[in-house]
Amino acid sequence: MPFQQLLSQLPDQALPVLLAYGALGGAYLLVVPLALLLWMNKRWHQMGKIERTAIYGMVFLFFPGLILFAPFINLRMAGQGEA
């Protein structure tokens, strides 16, 4: 039980701070980039200029999280079927 011993040695104020860091890190690396990928996949051909500019800014901001999902996401359009 080394984890419980580690938690008991921390000051009382440290646990909420660690939980807040974990929540913000999870949102930055997982939640927002996944929502951004789904939004781009759904709206790519219907976006206006302002929406596309905002999306590009968010891609720049959340790039580390997007890199984490990049190997698992396929954004290519479906083909016309077999030739």
UniProtKB/Swiss-Prot annotation:
EC numbers: 7.1.1.-
Keywords: Membrane, NAD, NADP, Plastoquinone, Quinone, Thylakoid, Translocase, Transmembrane, Transmembrane helix, Transport
Membrane disposition: Multi-pass membrane protein
Main location: membrane
Segments traversing the membrane: 17-37, 53-73
Top-level EC class as recorded in UniProt: translocase
InterPro entries assigned: NADH-quinone_OxRdatse_su_L
Function: NDH-1 shuttles electrons from an unknown electron donor, via FMN and iron-sulfur (Fe-S) centers, to quinones in the respiratory and/or the photosynthetic chain. The immediate electron acceptor for the enzyme in this species is believed to be plastoquinone. Couples the redox reaction to proton translocation, and thus conserves the redox energy in a proton gradient. Cyanobacterial NDH-1 also plays a role in inorganic carbon-concentration.
Protein family membership: Belongs to the complex I NdhL subunit family.
Subunit details: NDH-1 can be composed of about 15 different subunits; different subcomplexes with different compositions have been identified which probably have different functions.
UniProt name for this protein: NAD(P)H-quinone oxidoreductase subunit L
Organism: Synechococcus sp. (strain RCC307)
